[in-house]
């Protein structure tokens, strides 16, 4: 039923619960999982011009390293359980990148945590899970 499942990971407890749920589905349906972490493009807007380009570059590099670590931990968990896995580190607007990855990877299901961003950021950017669930071309499962 679900041969390929995309899981959005941001390191939050909610995204880890989503991963646990996706693992159960993968075991049941012998699915491959695609783990996706998105480094938010909005970080560029946070960095004031007077701070310099190098400071912004360092912040993005650190966020990318954090993302790689989140993906590596998820990949290790899945490989230990014999579940086929691929990882993707994206940069941009999280909902848009998750939707793009779902199409590019031809997934049958997207699994996301119900929350990940702080409430303040969610107010300004909107809920990633809400945007993905409304615009995805495949079923979306939101885990609480």
Which stretches of residues belong to each language-model region?
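Short, hinge-like loop/turn segments at secondary-structure boundaries
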Residues: 50-54, 104-105, 128-129
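Small/aliphatic-rich secondary-structure junction motif
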Residues: 3-55, 77, 83
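Structural beta-alpha unit
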Residues: 73-110
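A short acidic, glycine-rich active-site loop
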Residues: 54-69
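Glycine-rich, Arg-bearing micro-motifs that act as flexible, cationic patches
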Residues: 109-134
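Conserved beta-strand positions in the Rossmann-like core of class I SAM-dependent methyltransferases
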Residues: 34, 86, 141
């Amino acid at each position: 039923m679900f041969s390929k499942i995309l899981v959005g990971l941001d390191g939050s407890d909610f995204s880890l619960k989503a991963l646990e749920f996706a693992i159960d589905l993968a075991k049941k349906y012998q699915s491959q999982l695609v783990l996706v972490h998105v480094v938010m493009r909005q970080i560029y807007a946070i960095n004031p011009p007077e701070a310099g380009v190098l400071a912004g570059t360092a912040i993005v590099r650190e966020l990318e390293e954090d993302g790689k670590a989140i993906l590596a931990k998820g990949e290790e968990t899945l490989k230990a359980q014999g579940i086929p896995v691929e990882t993707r580190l994206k940069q941009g607007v999280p909902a848009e990148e998750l939707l793009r990855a779902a199409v590019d990877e031809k997934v049958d299901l997207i699994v996301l945590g119900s929350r990940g961003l702080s409430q303040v950021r969610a107010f300004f950017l909107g809920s990633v899970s809400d945007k993905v669930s409304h615009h995805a071309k495949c079923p979306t499962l939101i885990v609480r």
